[in-house]
C-alpha cells in the first residue's frame, strides 16, 4: 500500500517538518523580521496535503501539527479497474461459482447428495417417464414440494438426474448381461426399473440379492428369502416398459366395472314354455361380479329351473340312497366352485346352454388385460421374442470369472456370503411360458395354429373327453377307447380347444379347455348314421391317411390365403361360430363373466339366451349298457364262459362298439391307425371281415389302443393295470375263426385295467409265481385227449434247456414228434400226436406222473392259468402252428379228471372256500397244504404212499416233481 501511495512523486521544495522550527505559517512574527519571506512560499504549497488521503491539519499557533489517515476512500478511487495479469486467473473460478441457475434455490456443493426419499422419487419418476431426464427432474421436484413446501430439500436439476441415472446403472450393470441386438436405452431401463423394484421390496440389498437381479430382468419374477420370509418380486408393469414394448396405446381408456348386469332370455319357445310351466319368469336379471365363473352361473339356473321329474328323483335319492345308482352323467369335475344346494344325484334333465343374443356385436377385445398386468409378458425375454432377436440375453453364457450355479446351494457359515452374481443360473425350462399379446400378431394367427394341429393331438383330446364319460360306468377299467389317426374337417373343428391363460385376471377372449357335450353329440349322431361296408373298409384303410393329409394341407393353404386377403379381421368365422354356439357345463371350463363382457358386453350389461340341449343317443346307449347283465355271445367268436367275467367281457365289447362307432367316420378308414399294428395279417383280417365279427374287431382295437396310448386316471398318474386273461382268450378265438397265422414268437400284450374287487382270489396266485418265469428248466407236459379213459396216466414229459422262457421258438407238432406241445380238442383225431408219443415210452416211467398236475405246466409260461375259465376250441389241423395256444395259457382245457384237479378240491370243500376268504393276503404253499391236510384226517401220516397221494391231489410241490423228473431222466439214460 505504501508503494501505491508513492506513485505520484513528492515535490522537492517541501521541507520536512523538523527542519522548520518556526511555526509562523499562518501569521507573521510579532517583530516583523523575516516573517513575510517565510510565509509566502508555505502558502503556495498548501494544496499538496491531499496526497496523504484524508488529512486533518490542526494549525495552532506555537504547537506542532500531526497528520493521521482516517479513511482511504480516495485511495480506492485511484486504483485501476483492470487488475494485473497475476490476479486474473483465480478470479475466473470465483465468478463461475457465483453463477446461479433459475431452478436452483440453494447453492449446493460440488458433489450432489441424494437422500433416501429423493432416490424413491427418482425411481418412481423413472417408472413413469423413462429416460426423459427433464421430466424426471420436474416430477422429483414436484413430489418434494408437495411433500413439504418448507423443507430443506435441494431440488434436482436435469444434469443431476442424468448423473445419478448413469452412476446407478454402472454400479449394477455388471450383474446383467444383454444381447448385442438390444439397444442401450432398453438395457438401462430394464436394469434400473427392476433394481428399483427390488430396492422397494427389500430393506437392505446385499450381494446375494444383486445376483438375482439377472433372473428378475430376464424372467420377470423372482422369490427372495429375507428375514425368514419368501418375498416375491415382479417386474412392474409401468408406463416406461409398456411404452418400450408398445403396449401402452389403449390401456388408459379401458375401465371395467366391478359388477355387470346379466340379462337372460329364452332362445326359443320350447325354453320359454319349459320355464313358464314351472310358474317362473322366463326372463331373468342378475348382477354378478366379473370374476364369477360361468359354470357356476349355469349350474345356478339349471338348479333353479329343473323339471318336476328331476325334483322327484332328488327326493327319492334322499329317501332311498341305496336304490339309485351313483352319478353317471355328472362328470364335470373340472370346476373349482361347487354349489352346495345341488344334490349329487344323476341329472335327468338335458344340459342347459347359454349363448349370446343374436345380433349382438362380437368384437375382438381392444386389449389383453393379462398381457398388461402380467410381469411375464413384459420381461426382457418376452421383449426380445417380440422384437425377433436371434440371440437372447438369457441364453448367453456366464460372465468371465463367474462360476456356474450348482443344483443346490452349499451350506456355508452365517458370516460368509457368495461373491459371484451368477451362482444360481436359472434353468431354461424353469422360465414360465411367455404370453403373446395382440400387438405381436393378429388374434386369429394363434388360433389357426391351434386348429391345424396334428391328428394325434386331436385323438388325445377325444380320448380325454370320452374317458371322463366312461369312468362313471360300473366297470370303467374294462372299457377302452380306440386311438384316432384320421379325422375329418368337421371333427377337427369341433375338437379344437382354445388355450386358457394361467393368470387369474380376466382373459382377452373366452377360452375352453374341454370338448363340448353338444359338439360330441353331433359327432356321434353323424358318425353312427351308417355302418361301413367291408369294401369301404378295405379301400378306406389304404387311402384314408393320404387323403386326410391332403385335406389338412389344402385346409391350411386355404386358411393362409384367406388370412392374406383379409388384413387382420376382427375374429375368424370359426371363433364366431364357436361363440355363437354357446357354453354348457361341459365346455365352460374356467371362463368368467368378465371374459364374456369383454367380448360382447357393453354399458355394464351382458345379454345371454338359454336353451336346453337335445338328449343325445350316447346317454341312451350308456344307460342300456348299465342294465345289461348277461348276454350270450356268438359261438363262432367266443366259446362258453363261466362266472361274472363273461358279463364283464360283453360289457367291454358293447361299450367299445358304442364308442368306436361314435368316434369313427362313416365313410373313411378304421377307427385306429393301421400303422401302429405290428401284424399285417391282423389288419387284413379285420379289414376283410364281415359284420358278424364286430366283436373281434373291437377286441383288436382295444388291444391296439392300450398298446399305443397310455391312459391316465383321475389322480394324474398312470396306474398299474392288471392283466385281463379274457382278452387273450377272445383274441385266440378270433385268430381261430379267421385263420390268421402268426410267427413262432409270442407277442407281448399289455394288460387291461380291471377292478381289484372283481378278480378271483385264486387268480391272484399268479402274481406270486411270476418270479419263476426266468428259470432255465422248462417243464412241458403233453396233454391228454378228452376221449381217453379217465384212469389213464399222464403222458411223458420232455425237459428242454432254454435260454429264455418267453421268446424261445416253439417247435411244430406232427404225428410222431415227442418234443412238442399238443393241444386237446373236441375231435378224436386231434390227440394223435400225444397218443403216438405216449406209446413210445416205457411203462415203468409213468408211475412218476401221478405226482404232477397242471401247475407244473404253467410254471414255465408267463402267467398262471385261468383256473375257473375253460374255453373249448376246435382245431382241425393238428400239424398247424400252435403258437396261439402257447401264447394264451388260459385257453387250455381243464385236463383234470375226477378228484385230480386242485380246483375241484378247492371248490368242493367249504373249509377251503373259507381259507380263500380268510387268507386272501396269504397265498403260501404251507398254508394251502395245512388246510388240505385237514380234509382227510383219517389217513395215516406215516404212510409214504398216502402222503404222496395227498401232495399229488391237492398241492404244488415243484421240488418233489423235479426230483422225480431227474430220477426219471437218470433211469432213461441207464436204459
UniProtKB/Swiss-Prot annotation:
Major localization class: nucleus
Subcellular location: Nucleus
Gene3D superfamilies: Homeodomain-like (1.10.10.60)
Low complexity composition bias: residue spans: 815-833
Source species, domain of life: Eukaryota
Biased composition annotated in UniProt, kind: Basic and acidic residues: 86-98, 410-425
Region (Disordered): 1-37, 71-111, 318-346, 403-450, 809-844
GO annotation, cellular component aspect: nucleus
Entry keyword set: Developmental protein, DNA-binding, Nucleus, Transcription, Transcription regulation
Biological process annotations from GO: segment specification
Feature: compositional bias, Polar residues: 100-111
One example GO MF annotation: DNA binding
Every SANT domain range: 109-173
Biased composition (Pro residues): 7-20
Keyword Cell inner membrane part of the UniProt annotation: no
CDD domains the record matches: SANT (cd00167)
Keyword Transcription regulation: yes
Similarity field: Belongs to the cramped family.
Main function: Polycomb group (Pc-G) genes are needed to maintain expression patterns of the homeotic selector genes of the Antennapedia (Antp-C) and Bithorax (Bx-C) complexes, and hence for the maintenance of segmental determination. Can act as a modifier of position effect variegation (PEV).
Protein name per its UniProtKB record: Protein cramped
Protein encoded by which gene: crm
Amino acid at each position: 500500500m505504501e508503494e501505491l501511495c508513492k506513485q505520484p512523486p513528492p515535490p522537492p521544495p517541501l521541507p520536512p517538518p523538523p527542519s522548520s522550527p518556526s511555526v509562523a505559517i499562518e501569521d507573521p512574527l510579532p517583530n516583523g523580521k523575516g516573517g513575510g519571506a517565510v510565509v509566502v512560499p508555505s502558502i503556495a504549497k498548501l494544496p499538496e496535503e491531499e496526497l496523504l488521503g484524508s488529512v486533518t491539519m490542526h494549525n495552532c499557533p506555537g504547537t506542532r501539527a500531526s497528520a493521521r489517515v482516517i479513511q482511504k476512500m480516495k485511495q480506492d478511487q485511484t486504483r485501476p479497474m483492470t487488475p494485473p495479469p497475476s490476479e486474473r486467473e483465480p478470479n475466473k473460478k470465483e465468478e463461475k461459482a457465483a453463477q446461479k441457475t433459475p431452478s436452483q434455490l440453494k447453492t449446493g456443493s460440488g458433489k450432489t447428495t441424494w437422500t433416501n426419499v429423493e432416490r424413491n422419487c427418482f425411481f418412481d419418476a423413472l417408472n413413469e417417464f423413462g429416460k426423459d431426464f427433464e421430466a424426471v427432474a420436474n416430477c422429483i421436484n414436484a413430489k418434494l414440494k408437495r411433500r413439504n413446501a418448507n423443507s430443506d430439500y435441494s431440488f434436482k436439476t436435469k444434469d443431476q438426474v442424468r448423473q445419478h441415472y448413469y452412476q446407478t446403472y454402472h454400479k449394477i450393470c455388471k450383474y446383467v448381461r444383454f444381447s448385442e441386438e438390444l439397444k442401450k436405452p432398453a438395457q438401462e431401463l430394464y436394469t434400473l426399473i427392476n433394481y428399483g423394484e427390488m430396492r422397494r421390496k427389500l430393506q437392505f440389498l446385499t450381494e446375494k440379492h444383486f445376483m438375482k437381479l439377472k433372473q428378475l430382468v430376464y424372467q420377470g419374477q423372482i422369490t427372495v428369502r429375507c428375514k425368514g420370509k419368501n418375498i416375491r418380486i415382479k417386474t412392474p408393469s409401468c408406463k416406461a416398459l409398456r411404452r418400450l414394448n408398445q403396449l401402452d396405446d389403449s390401456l388408459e381408456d379401458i375401465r371395467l366395472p366391478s359388477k355387470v348386469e346379466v340379462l337372460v332370455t329364452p332362445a326359443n319357445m320350447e325354453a320359454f314354455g319349459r320355464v313358464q310351466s314351472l310358474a317362473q319368469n322366463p326372463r331373468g336379471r342378475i348382477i354378478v361380479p366379473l370374476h364369477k365363473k360361468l359354470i357356476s352361473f349355469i349350474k345356478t339356473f339349471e338348479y333353479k329351473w329343473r323339471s318336476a321329474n328331476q325334483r322327484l328323483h332328488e327326493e327319492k335319492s334322499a329317501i332311498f340312497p341305496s336304490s339309485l345308482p351313483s352319478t353317471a352323467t355328472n362328470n364335470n369335475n373340472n370346476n373349482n366352485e361347487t354349489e352346495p344346494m345341488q344334490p349329487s344325484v344323476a341329472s335327468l334333465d338335458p344340459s342347459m346352454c347359454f349363448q349370446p343374443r343374436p345380433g349382438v356385436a362380437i368384437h375382438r377385445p381392444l386389449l389383453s388385460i393379462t398381457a398388461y398386468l402380467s410381469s411375464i409378458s413384459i420381461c426382457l425375454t418376452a421383449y426380445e421374442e417380440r422384437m425377433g432377436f436371434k440371440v437372447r440375453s438369457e441364453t448367453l453364457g456366464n460372465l468371465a470369472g463367474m462360476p456356474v450355479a450348482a443344483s443346490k446351494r452349499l451350506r456355508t457359515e452365517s458370516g460368509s456370503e457368495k461373491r459371484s452374481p451368477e451362482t444360481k443360473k436359472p434353468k431354461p425350462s424353469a422360465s414360465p411360458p411367455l404370453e403373446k399379446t395382440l400387438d405381436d400378431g393378429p388374434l386369429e394367427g394363434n388360433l389357426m395354429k391351434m386348429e391345424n394341429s396334428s391328428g394325434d393331438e386331436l385323438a388325445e383330446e377325444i380320448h380325454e373327453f370320452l374317458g371322463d364319460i366312461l369312468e362313471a360306468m360300473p366297470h370303467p377299467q374294462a372299457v377302452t377307447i380306440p386311438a384316432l389317426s384320421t379325422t375329418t374337417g368337421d371333427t377337427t373343428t369341433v375338437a379344437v380347444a382354445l388355450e386358457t391363460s394361467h393368470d387369474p385376471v380376466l382373459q382377452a377372449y373366452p377360452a375352453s379347455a374341454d370338448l363340448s357335450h353338444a359338439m360330441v353329440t353331433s359327432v356321434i349322431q353323424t358318425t353312427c348314421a351308417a355302418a361301413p361296408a367291408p369294401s369301404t373298409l378295405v379301400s378306406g384303410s389304404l387311402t384314408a391317411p393320404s387323403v386326410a393329409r391332403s385335406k389338412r394341407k389344402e385346409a391350411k393353404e386355404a386358411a393362409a390365403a384367406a388370412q392374406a386377403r383379409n388384413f387382420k379381421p376382427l375374429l375368424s368365422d370359426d371363433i364366431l361360430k364357436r361363440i355363437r354356439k354357446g357354453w354348457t357345463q361341459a365346455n365352460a371350463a374356467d371362463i368368467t363373466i368378465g371374459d364374456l363382457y369383454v367380448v360382447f358386453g357393453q354399458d355394464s350389461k351382458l345379454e345371454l339366451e338359454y336353451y336346453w340341449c337335445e338328449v343325445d343317443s350316447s346317454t341312451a346307449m350308456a344307460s342300456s349298457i348299465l342294465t345289461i347283465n348277461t348276454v350270450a355271445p356268438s359261438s363262432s367268436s367266443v366259446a362258453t364262459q363261466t362266472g361274472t367275467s363273461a358279463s364283464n367281457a360283453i360289457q367291454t365289447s358293447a361299450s367299445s362298439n358304442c364308442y368306436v362307432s361314435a368316434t369313427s367316420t362313416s365313410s373313411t378308414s378304421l377307427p385306429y391307425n393301421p400303422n401302429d399294428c405290428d401284424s399285417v395279417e391282423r389288419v387284413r383280417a379285420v379289414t376283410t371281415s364281415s359284420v358278424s365279427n364286430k366283436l373281434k374287431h373291437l377286441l383288436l382295437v382295444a388291444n391296439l389302443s392300450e398298446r399305443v396310448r397310455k391312459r391316465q386316471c383321475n389322480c394324474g398318474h398312470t396306474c398299474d393295470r392288471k392283466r385281463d386273461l379274457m382278452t387273450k382268450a377272445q383274441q385266440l378265438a378270433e385268430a381261430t375263426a379267421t385263420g390268421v397265422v402268426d410267427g413262432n414268437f409270442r407277442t407281448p400284450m399289455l394288460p387291461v385295467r380291471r377292478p381289484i374287487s372283481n378278480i378271483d382270489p385264486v387268480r391272484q396266485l399268479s402274481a406270486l409265481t411270476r418270479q419263476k418265469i426266468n428259470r432255465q428248466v422248462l417243464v412241458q407236459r403233453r396233454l391228454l385227449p378228452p376221449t381217453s379213459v379217465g384212469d389213464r396216466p399222464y403222458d411223458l414229459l420232455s425237459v428242454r434247456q432254454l435260454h429264455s422262457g418267453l421268446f424261445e421258438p416253439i417247435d411244430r407238432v406232427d404225428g410222431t414228434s415227442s418234443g412238442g406241445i399238443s393241444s386237446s380238442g373236441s375231435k378224436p383225431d386231434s390227440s394223435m400226436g400225444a397218443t403216438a408219443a405216449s406209446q413210445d415210452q416205457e411203462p415203468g416211467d409213468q408211475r412218476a406222473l401221478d405226482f404232477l398236475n397242471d401247475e407244473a405246466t404253467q410254471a414255465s409260461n408267463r402267467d398262471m392259468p385261468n383256473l375257473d375259465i375253460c374255453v373249448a376250441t376246435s382245431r382241425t389241423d393238428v400239424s398247424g402252428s400252435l403258437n396261439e395256444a402257447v401264447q394264451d395259457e388260459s385257453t387250455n382245457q381243464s385236463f383234470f379228471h375226477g378228484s385230480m384237479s386242485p380246483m375241484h378240491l378247492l371248490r368242493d370243500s367249504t373249509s377251503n372256500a373259507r381259507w380263500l376268504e380268510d387268507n386272501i393276503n396269504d397265498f403260501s404253499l404251507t398254508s394251502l397244504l395245512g388246510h388240505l391236510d385237514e380234509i382227510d384226517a383219517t389217513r395215516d401220516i406215516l404212510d409214504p404212499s398216502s402222503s404222496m397221494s395227498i401232495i399229488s391231489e391237492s398241492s404244488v410241490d415243484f421240488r418233489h416233481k423235479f426230483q422225480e423228473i431227474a430220477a426219471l431222466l437218470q433211469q432213461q439214460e441207464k436204459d
